[in-house]
UniProtKB/Swiss-Prot annotation:
This is Glycine cleavage system H protein. The gene is gcvH. Belongs to the GcvH family. Binds 1 lipoyl cofactor covalently. Residues 24-106 form the Lipoyl-binding domain. Keywords: Lipoyl. GO terms for cellular component: cytosol; glycine cleavage complex. Its cofactor is (R)-lipoate. The keyword rRNA-binding does not apply. InterPro entries: 2-oxoA_DH_lipoyl-BS, Biotin_lipoyl, GCV_H, GCV_H/Fam206, GCV_H_sub, Single_hybrid_motif. The modification N6-lipoyllysine is found at residue 65. Gene3D superfamilies: 2.40.50.100. The glycine cleavage system is composed of four proteins: P, T, L and H. It holds the Pfam family GCV_H.
């Protein structure tokens, strides 16, 4: 059973978002997603300054099992990326909701957040897989 923190919002494609004090959102992949993928070997992230559209592929998580596209859960500008993943992609496995975050985005349309899932809704998505 994967850990699904209640304070986060989730996309059905297994990304999570966490609101930060400056109004930006940190994005990563869920513990469930990293369990499915297995040991990470490489993470390709967007560039700081990139403009993302919700639902577009914007990063790649490559594991010993597969390479998986990571989708932007929100539209907006990339403010920061987790440079630690360049040398330590395994942080996604060891701390998916903490040190294994992917990037931060300043949303251009906060209404998109309403279309994301709460923890209960995300659990239902996992249960249907």
């Amino acid at each position: 059973m994967s850990n699904i923190p209640a304070e986060l919002k989730y996309a059905s494609s297994h990304e999570w978002i966490r609101k930060e004090e400056d109004g930006s959102y940190t994005v990563g992949i869920s513990e469930h997603a990293q369990e499915l993928l297995g040991d990470m070997v490489f993470i390709e992230l967007p560039d700081v300054g990139d403009t993302l559209s919700a639902g577009e592929d914007c990063a790649v998580a490559e594991s010993v099992k597969a390479a998986s596209d990571i989708y932007a859960p929100l539209s907006g500008e990339v403010l920061a990326i987790n440079e630690a993943l360049e040398d330590s992609p395994e942080l996604v496995n060891s701390d998916a909701f903490g040190d294994g975050w992917f990037f931060r985005v300043m949303p251009s349309d906060v209404a998109e957040i309403d279309s994301l899932l709460d923890a209960e809704g995300y659990q239902a998505v996992i249960d249907e897989e």
